[in-house]
């Protein structure tokens, strides 16, 4: 996990040049500090990935391949994690059937999902419950929408990584975090700047 910060003139996006500069610099640092071959790179984008950012990512990867820092067959995977999805979905666990048309009360038979529950929409989209009934919060769990537009990893591995990173709730270790550490730490940093 590598999180670095850089100010941008544009509020919600980085320039192509910024992306190239940061990725080349910090992937080189990662390579210099490991004996392992860097075979998979996963980039988490808070919100929508802009075309200039995508271009910067692939230009940086190409430069790193040309320098011999990355192998030619490196897998580049990009995940978009919007704060708000246009698709609204709630997951529940129903312990016992009851007549929902006539009974307004569920008598405790409808619970928030277990943390880590997920549903795959297709090979490029899924919802993941990074919060759940194990942590007492008011309301229903709001699953995180995962969009995986670029890459060749199985979406199940992408979901698993995001779940594990969401368990790193360093600001409150006895609680859960809706967002993975890769997004949460950046949000906290931006709020300080």
Residues covered by each model-derived region:
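Long, contiguous domain-sized segments
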Residues: 1-193
């Amino acid at each position: 996990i590598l999180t670095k910060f850089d100010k941008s003139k544009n509020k919600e996006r980085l320039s192509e040049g910024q992306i190239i500069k940061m990725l080349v610099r910090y992937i080189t640092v990662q390579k210099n500090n490991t004996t392992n071959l860097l075979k998979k790179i996963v980039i988490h984008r808070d919100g929508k990935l802009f075309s200039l950012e995508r271009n910067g990512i692939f230009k940086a990867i190409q430069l790193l391949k040309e320098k011999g820092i990355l192998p030619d067959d490196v897998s580049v995977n990009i995940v978009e994690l919007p704060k708000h999805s246009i698709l609204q979905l709630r997951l529940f666990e129903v312990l016992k059937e009851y007549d929902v048309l006539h009974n307004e009360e569920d008598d405790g038979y409808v619970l928030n999902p277990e943390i880590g529950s997920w549903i795959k929409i297709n090979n490029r989209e899924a919802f993941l419950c990074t919060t759940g009934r194990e942590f007492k919060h008011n309301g229903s769990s709001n699953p995180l929408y995962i969009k995986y537009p670029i890459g060749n990893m199985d979406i199940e591995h992408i979901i698993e990584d995001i779940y594990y990173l969401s368990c790193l709730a360093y600001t409150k270790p006895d609680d859960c975090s809706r967002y993975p550490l890769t997004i949460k730490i950046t949000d906290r940093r931006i709020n300080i700047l």
